[in-house]
Amino acid sequence: VLKAISCGREPTDVELASVSLPEGTVWIDLLDPTSEEIGWTERNLGVRIPSRHDLSEIELSSRLAKEGENMYLSAPVIGAATIEHADLTPAGFIVTPHVLITVRFETLPTFDIVAQRLEHDKTLTTSMAVFVALMEAIVDVVPTYLSTWLLP
């Protein structure tokens, strides 16, 4: 699924027949993307979309890279979680000067929270602002699970 997310609007599906993004798009979210969606994103935004294998690399040197003006990051993110267990899933972040591109392979509640926030928060107008909001949401859920697992 390839979604375009803009400040003040609901997320919209990107038409692969189009060569441009909806006006005001600050975040492209690729959820379990098809090869067509990956190809569209690479062609139209001039980025390299990392594979699931690339995003799953555990070496620190594989987690952060800069290519031209684009910053590539990967991190394990808490996906499905219960009181006893949490699944970690790889997620990728490409911060470009104009748009944040995320790549994930599972539904992640933290991403949904930030997407909903963008509908109402008029301050998230840049790729970096959206990236920071996502990082805050990801970090904010960790103490909840840690306290549940570590405290009797």
Locate predicted features.
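Peripheral, non-transmembrane regulatory/ligand-interaction domains of membrane transport proteins
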Residues: 1-152
